[in-house]
Amino acid sequence: MPMLQSIKWENNTVYILDQRLLPDKVEYLKCTHYEQIAGAIENLSIRGAPAIGIATAWAVAVASMSLNASSSEELFSDLNPVFQRLINTRPTAINIKWAIDRMQNLIKNNLSLPVSELKDMILNEAIRIHNEDIQVNKRIGEYALAFFKEGCTVITYCNAGALATGGYGTATAPMYLAKEKGIKFKVIACETRPVLQGARITAFELMKAGIDVTLICDNTAGALLRKGMIDFAIVGTDRTVRNGDVANKIGTYSLSVLCKENNVPFYVAAPTSSIDLSIPSGDMIPIEERSFEEVTTIKGVKIAPEGIKVINFAFDVTPAKYVTAIITEKGIFKPSEIKHLRLRQ
């Protein structure tokens, strides 16, 4: 597994890798208050659906330790503003709500315990959520490894890598496992405008792991697909819903259509924590809109005229008809089969 971690727990403190600075600097943010973690989620210091789910769990643990509640019931009540603050950080990724639901269920089921014991349970649950994610990603990688044939070329989008998760990544997990097994393959990484997660993060982490990776502008993908230079695509997901529609980084939909047009398989790596069976179709997924400055500047340098109007959706929805298969820690499924999955609680 790559040495660099998106988030870690040391000496009763959460440390978050500030991914805004990659690849130029590797710096960790020291977080001793839940608001610091919430801010890091909002400003993309930490990003990737599984990683922000883990960060949410750690935020709840940090908050609970700082509260001076006299009973478990009082602790639960005092945590309600924390839950709401975290839910409001980023609306599209389901993992934040998933982590909060899990923490709330733990607390509700143990309100009879002394508050000190409940706080210990909350901390241990955060550790468990973090460790589980690493194992889930590895299992996704083991299933997806079947698609990695000797000499293949795979295209990926945004960053569904180790730095978007607790470790291994979702879409990148089979890449790390293929590398370990000595399978020769190439990765094409789309730069992923406007925040350039593919260029800054995916290219960075794959190069660091010694994986053969080539960076392209997003609008080069179609040309490579038409020339037959890509064997398959694999991407992550921030929320996959009951009918198999997939919300992921803006531009994923475009790539899926190009793959369909050129008869190239399009796979989605989805931990069950990112699957939301309460929503029937992608049309109902809330889509986050972010600051115009992400589009009009790159690393603080203006690239557009002052006052230009901007549309900046952070995510788009890929309809199930463009998805060849969804790879979870429970196996590989057709999009139409997702509604039958028993999800991880």
From Swiss-Prot:
It comes from the Bacteria. The active site is at D238. It is an enzyme of class 5 (isomerase). GO terms for biological process: L-methionine salvage from methylthioadenosine. Keywords: Amino-acid biosynthesis, Isomerase, Methionine biosynthesis. The record marks C158 as: Transition state stabilizer. Pathway: Amino-acid biosynthesis; L-methionine biosynthesis via salvage pathway; L-methionine from S-methyl-5-thio-alpha-D-ribose 1-phosphate: step 1/6. Its EC number is 5.3.1.23. The keyword Transit peptide does not apply. GO terms for molecular function: S-methyl-5-thioribose-1-phosphate isomerase activity. Substrate binds at R47, G48, A49, R90, Q197, N248, K249. It catalyses: 5-(methylsulfanyl)-alpha-D-ribose 1-phosphate = 5-(methylsulfanyl)-D-ribulose 1-phosphate. Catalyzes the interconversion of methylthioribose-1-phosphate (MTR-1-P) into methylthioribulose-1-phosphate (MTRu-1-P). Belongs to the eIF-2B alpha/beta/delta subunits family. MtnA subfamily. This is Methylthioribose-1-phosphate isomerase.
